[in-house]
Amino acid sequence: MPTTFHEIPRERPLTPLLDSANTPDELRRLAEADLETLADELRQYLLYSVGQSGGHFGAGLGVIELTIALHYVFDTPDDRLVWDVGHQAYPHKILTGRRERMGSLRQKDGLAAFPRRSESEYDTFGVGHSSTSISAALGMAIAARLKGEKRKSVAVIGDGALTAGMAFEALNHATDVGANMLVILNDNDMSISKNVGGLSNYLAKIISSRTYASMREGSKKILSRLPGAWEIARKVEEHAKGMLVPGTLFEELGWNYVGPIDGHDLPTLLATLRNMRDLDGPQFLHVVTKKGKGFAPAEADPIGYHAITKLEPVTPSAVPRKPSGPKYSNVFGQWLCDMAAADQRLVGITPAMKEGSDLVAFAERFPERYFDVAIAEQHAVTLAAGMACDGVKPVVAIYSTFLQRAYDQLIHDVAVQNLDVLFAIDRAGLVGEDGPTHAGSFDISYLRCIPGMLVMTPSDENELRRMLTTGYLFDGPAAVRYPRGSGPNAPLDAGLELLEIGKAIVRRQGKGAALLVFGVQLAEALQVGEALNATVVDMRFVKPLDEALLRELAGSHELLVTIEENAVMGGAGSAVSEFLAAQNIIKPLLHLGLPDYYVEHAKPAQMLAECGLDQAGIERAVRERLDQLRA
């Protein structure tokens, strides 16, 4: 069984076996008897490397044995291995030639937090969002068939990701086309129970064997000649298996279900995977793992150890940390509790982001009004629409990048019917080390084009609180988009204050250029305003715009500058351009925002500097444009 560690090593551990297995080809040269020692070394090295870089933690510890077994049994990268989401892919990265670069994980120009096709031939599909692996692996299996190639496609998906409808759509389609593929359910949501032991492992070996498959097909041919005999035999078989394994659903969908087996038992994993590798058609293997396996603190607190920050140096830096305010998600969580206490109609809905969106306190105080729908963004939005139809006031707490998955429901089910649903959109803008798959780069663009939608962008924590109240009481759909991380520590209202809809506020009066800020770049814009004696406006509302103020500013300034942490294309700057054009107002404009490419992972400050959205970048761009206009 795996060795249990109790501390994250600060010094690089000795890993002689791991050092000899830089690639899967080298891994496959090791004796099978050495693999359990390799697993211990890989687990210890993972602890060390994530301690140096920070990153997703518990999921990778839980798939050490499975990762070794997959690369040992399958001929990767010729056999296609697709990881769902990618939180668990760090051991895979270590075993596929990237061990020496793990220290650069999630850093600028370093390894990505998730599998990336551009990073390694072993990363067969880029991921970050959940529940895509089965569809992708199915596509690869069909491509292999069309090209006459004899290779396997393997999808590894977690029990949480399997709750999404997309996963079941793929499961259903795979059996319809008879795909030659293997789906592995990495079930780390339950402990290894009594049925995941010797008997279950033994049964899995039998069921997955070619002998069993041949006998089953032979029996089917013989019994099919007798009226009703095969159907009776099939039901007897399913009943016998059902007493020991929970795979009836997958069998009914047409998959050959095997398991559950202990995902930390390497001999059983190897034997079962070898058997299933040699079977044709859609195969489904259920493995049970423990998140955080082999690291005692993570086993005890898998949620807390889902991801960790890098270890602090033993001798702390003498440079004091800059004080900051509460996280925007914490401000939302407190507002939600305050508004729920004031209005019994309020309900909170989240697609599996209870901790990330800070609904923990709300769920504890108002459990009957809290709904975690799991990874089901489409359902979350239409559920909210149904509630709103009958007088309930839903607040959907969702990350910007995940709301993209429910865009049709947002328009068709909420906006077209003008329903009172508030979208609290967390992680808007750049998100740092998680990279482009998790960035909220497009929400202003895809929200502002929806008729009747109220769209707001706070500049600080108190503005967020006021906008949430304003959106909640708005007659129709409303969205407040706010970033990851902490605010500037603005004083918070004690009560629930409203904003005048569509009303911006001039934060600094100047001349020459007017900086129109949509969001949290207000502090940087004010610094630029001081340097250039420019006007600075906290726009607050993307939709509706403060049209009267825009007319006034266009008439009194040389240049209008829009600043937003959203794609420039179709963003708030575009809204200003469209308004001025409709009013036949010709005015020089400068749009600052996210460029027309995916900004790669780095520290947030590095990403903002790359995009010209830090104080220096904004000032430089405005000076250059003013110089051009005045030349």
From Swiss-Prot:
Enzyme kind, highest EC tier: transferase
Transmembrane segments: none
The protein's required cofactors: Mg(2+); thiamine diphosphate
Annotated Pfam families: DXP_synthase_N, Transket_pyr, Transketolase_C
SUPFAM superfamilies the UniProt entry points to: Thiamin diphosphate-binding fold (THDP-binding) (SSF52518), TK C-terminal domain-like (SSF52922)
Region annotation (Disordered) ranges: 1-21
Binding site for Mg(2+): D159, N188
Molecular-function annotations in GO: 1-deoxy-D-xylulose-5-phosphate synthase activity; magnesium ion binding; thiamine pyrophosphate binding
The protein's annotated pathway: Metabolic intermediate biosynthesis; 1-deoxy-D-xylulose 5-phosphate biosynthesis; 1-deoxy-D-xylulose 5-phosphate from D-glyceraldehyde 3-phosphate and pyruvate: step 1/1
Cofactor detail note: Binds 1 Mg(2+) ion per subunit.
UniProt binding sites for thiamine diphosphate: H87, G128, H129, S130, G160, A161, N188, F295, E377
Catalytic activity reported: D-glyceraldehyde 3-phosphate + pyruvate + H(+) = 1-deoxy-D-xylulose 5-phosphate + CO2
Disulphides: none
Entry keywords, A to Z: Isoprene biosynthesis, Magnesium, Metal-binding, Thiamine biosynthesis, Thiamine pyrophosphate, Transferase
Enzyme Commission code(s) on record: 2.2.1.7
The family this protein is said to belong to: Belongs to the transketolase family. DXPS subfamily.
Subunit organization: Homodimer.
Name of the protein: 1-deoxy-D-xylulose-5-phosphate synthase
UniProt lineage: Bacteria, Pseudomonadati, Pseudomonadota, Gammaproteobacteria, Pseudomonadales
